[in-house]
C-alpha cells in the first residue's frame, strides 16, 4: 500500500515534531537567573501604567540586580568563610557591604541584626602607640 505515514505515523504525515517551536523565557534568552517578566510587571506597577517601558528595560534592570546580588553574596560568603561558618547571616552581609567602599555608598540602609563595624578612633590609637614607643625608648 502506498502513501505510508512513515515511522512516526499519526496526523502529521510522518514529518515528526521537528518544526514545533519551544517557548523560552526572556530570562533564559538573556542568560539570566532572575525573572525578567516579574521585574517588568513591577516596573509597570511602580509607574502606574503612565509611562511606556521599553522591551529591554526590564532585561537590563534584571541583569543589574542579578550582578549586584551576586557581588554582595560573594563578599558575604567570603566573610562567612573567614569566620569558619557555612551559613550567611545578616552580620556577614553587613561586614561585606560596609567593607566594600562602593557598596557602602550604594547601600546606605540599615541591615537588621547586622551589628556595627568595629572601629577605634585614630586619635586614640596614636596616643596608645606613642605611650608604647615612649616606654621602649626609656628602657
Swiss-Prot record:
Chain spans, region Disordered: 1-28
One of the record's GO molecular function terms: DNA binding
Matches recorded under SUPFAM superfamilies: Histone-fold
Gene Ontology biological process terms, A to Z: heterochromatin formation
InterPro entries: Histone-fold (IPR009072), Histone_H2A (IPR002119), Histone_H2A/H2B/H3 (IPR007125), Histone_H2A_C (IPR032454)
Transmembrane segment boundaries: none
Record note on modification: Acetylated once deposited into chromatin.
Localization of this protein: Nucleus; Chromosome
One GO term describing the cellular component: nucleus
Keywords tagged on the record: Acetylation, Chromosome, DNA-binding, Nucleosome core, Nucleus
Biased composition (Gly residues): 1-13
Residues found modified as N6-acetyllysine: 5, 11
Function: Variant histone H2A which can replace H2A in some nucleosomes. Nucleosomes wrap and compact DNA into chromatin, limiting DNA accessibility to the cellular machineries which require DNA as a template. Histones thereby play a central role in transcription regulation, DNA repair, DNA replication and chromosomal stability. DNA accessibility is regulated via a complex set of post-translational modifications of histones, also called histone code, and nucleosome remodeling.
Subunit structure, as described in the record: The nucleosome is a histone octamer containing two molecules each of H2A, H2B, H3 and H4 assembled in one H3-H4 heterotetramer and two H2A-H2B heterodimers. The octamer wraps approximately 147 bp of DNA. H2A or its variant H2A.Z forms a heterodimer with H2B. H2A.Z associates with the VPS72/SWC2 subunit of the SWR1 chromatin remodeling complex. Also interacts with RBP1/DNA-directed RNA polymerase II largest subunit.
PANTHER family linked to this entry: HISTONE H2A (PTHR23430)
Family recorded in the similarity comment: Belongs to the histone H2A family.
Protein name: Histone H2A.Z
Organism per entry: Phaeosphaeria nodorum (strain SN15 / ATCC MYA-4574 / FGSC 10173)
Amino acid at each position: 500500500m502506498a502513501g505510508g505515514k512513515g515511522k512516526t505515523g499519526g496526523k502529521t504525515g510522518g514529518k515528526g515534531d521537528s518544526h514545533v517551536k519551544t517557548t523560552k523565557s526572556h530570562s533564559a534568552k538573556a542568560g539570566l537567573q532572575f525573572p525578567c517578566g516579574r521585574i517588568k510587571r513591577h516596573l509597570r506597577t511602580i509607574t502606574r501604567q503612565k509611562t511606556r517601558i521599553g522591551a529591554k528595560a526590564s532585561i537590563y534592570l534584571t541583569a543589574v540586580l542579578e550582578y549586584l546580588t551576586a557581588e554582595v553574596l560573594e563578599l558575604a560568603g567570603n566573610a562567612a568563610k573567614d569566620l569558619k561558618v557555612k551559613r550567611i547571616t545578616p552580620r556577614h552581609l553587613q561586614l561585606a557591604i560596609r567593607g566594600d567602599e562602593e557598596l557602602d555608598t550604594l547601600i546606605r540602609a540599615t541591615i537588621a541584626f547586622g551589628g556595627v563595624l568595629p572601629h577605634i578612633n585614630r586619635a586614640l590609637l596614636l596616643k596608645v602607640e606613642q605611650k608604647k614607643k615612649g616606654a621602649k625608648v626609656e628602657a
